[in-house]
Amino acid sequence: FPYVDNPTLYHAVKNSVKENGLRIFLTATSTDELDRKVRSGELKRLSLPRRFHGNPLIIPKPVWLSDFNRYLDKKCLSPKLKSYIEKQRKTGYPLLLFASEIKKGEQLKEILQEQFPNEKIGFVSSVTEDRLEQVQAFRDGELTILISTTILERGVTFPCVDVFVVEANHRLFTKSSLIQIGGRVGRSMDRPTGDLLFFHDGLNASIKKAIKEIQQMNKEA
């Protein structure tokens, strides 16, 4: 991102390479087009599926949650989701919670602050002015729960974090974004494990493909 699925950038890179030059694509989440070129022999694929600490990637656990929006509309938290958050908070590990939309993320923050008054809760999105400060506060332990849109799906590391994705079957959570989100868990030598929960009201192709691809990477490792 923003290279993926952008024909203009692909064309610009292709035209910039010397006649005998090489193009190397580095990605944690391949695309259908790159996979097609590998199958046709146009590209060769090299995989590094194992993490630096040698432990496997965390497999997402799908969790059925059908009443999220119904309770959110009432400015309440689904009892089932609340129960999972309560259980997670007893561990003492930070919780990174992904919401599908900015408005829902803002609503979640307000509700969680009311339901969990002892927690320090933040929310970040593409329009959050102090996003970097909140991210650092979460990393430093000054925030215990951070709610985010897909803006934090990649490029950040939070030691020992657990991740919940609410409405994981939402159209904005693609296979690639779910894999990237899952990659936030288990990155630390101190805790190479963690909880990775995909809350949904219907398993879709993105969730299934993300789980399958993560399982395949573990097999290759």
Predicted regions and their residues:
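A short beta-strand element within the Helicase C-terminal
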Residues: 156-169, 179, 195-197
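A short beta-strand-to-loop transition that corresponds to the Sensor-1 phosphate-sensing loop
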Residues: 26-30, 49-52, 99-102, 148-151, ...
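Short glycine-/polar-rich loops that comprise or flank the Walker A/P-loop
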Residues: 18-22, 41-44, 117-119, 159-162, ...
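Loop/turn-to-beta-strand initiation segments
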Residues: 18-26, 93-94, 142-145
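Conserved helicase motor
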Residues: 99-103, 121-133, 147-154
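Conserved strand-helix element at the start of the C-terminal RecA-like helicase core
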Residues: 23, 74, 78, 84-113
